[in-house]
Amino acid sequence: MILGAIGARSKHLRFFQQALDLLPPGQRIGPVCAFDAPEQLPALTDFEICVSAEEVITHSDAVLLLLREGYLHAALAELALKQGKAVFVDKPFACDVAQARAMADLSHKTGTPCTGGSTICFTPQVHELCAALPRCSEYTLTYQADPFSPFGGWYFYGSHLTDLCTCLFGGGFHAVQARCENSVVTADVLYPDFSVHLRSTPGVQPPVLLADRAYLLDDQGCYPAGMKHFLSVIKKETPGCAERLVSSVKLMEAIIAGLRV
């Protein structure tokens, strides 16, 4: 199976290729379009370089969208989905709900899978937590994210937290209160019977869920987990998670709006 990749600025192109190398043989990243980072081309000689995203899609069995700029994902996902090519949309899935909704709806309409977001959500540990989440009145999720990052502000790393929140707790939140002080972002996400507190700082730290105890989440083995998930989605053994990601983008929008007040 040949996976095409669009986007080469982030390290995820290499991370995902390394992840595929750890899985049973039979799939690899072939064509790559690096329109977002042409300066990376000299280091990409082990891939088949394409000049356009359309060329990548045509010569691939499925597509990885690896752009840091989430607002570019929807148009590219549309091209792939209309050609019947399953899509993995890297984080951030989108930067507004309308674009996220469009990808989810087109996936449903075409019957072509669309999935993606933070690969931490696909680790066995998170699957186990989803299946047997301790019952608490309050939870806290913490991870690193810089609201002033040159890589798309809080969208790029903050989407880990919104993806994890909607993965673990669903999209049924009814209110969000967010604030930023000294680059520390905190958001209170209110559900009918409990609340989830999201907290990020720019410094390097592992992702942690605080519930009945502290759960250290895996942000290293997550790349193979993400690719294993995508391959299962391509084969239609596992459903994509585009609907959940719409909820994540909705949560992201609410947090960003709160930070602007």
Predicted feature residues:
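Short beta->alpha connector loops
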Residues: 9-11, 68-71, 93-94, 120-122, ...
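Conserved acidic residues
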Residues: 32, 61, 137
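Rossmann-like dinucleotide-binding domain that binds NAD(P)(H)
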Residues: 141-203, 243-250
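N-terminal Rossmann-like dinucleotide-binding module
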Residues: 1-44, 134, 244, 248, ...
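C-terminal helix-rich "cap/oligomerization" subdomain common to oxidoreductases
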Residues: 42, 55, 59-67, 233-261
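A contiguous active-site-proximal alpha/beta segment in oxidoreductase catalytic domains
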Residues: 94-148
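Beta-loop-alpha module in the N-terminal Rossmann-like domain of NAD(P)-dependent dehydrogenases
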Residues: 27, 45-88, 92-104
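C-terminal substrate-binding/catalytic lobe of Rossmann-fold NAD(P)-dependent oxidoreductases
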Residues: 182-230
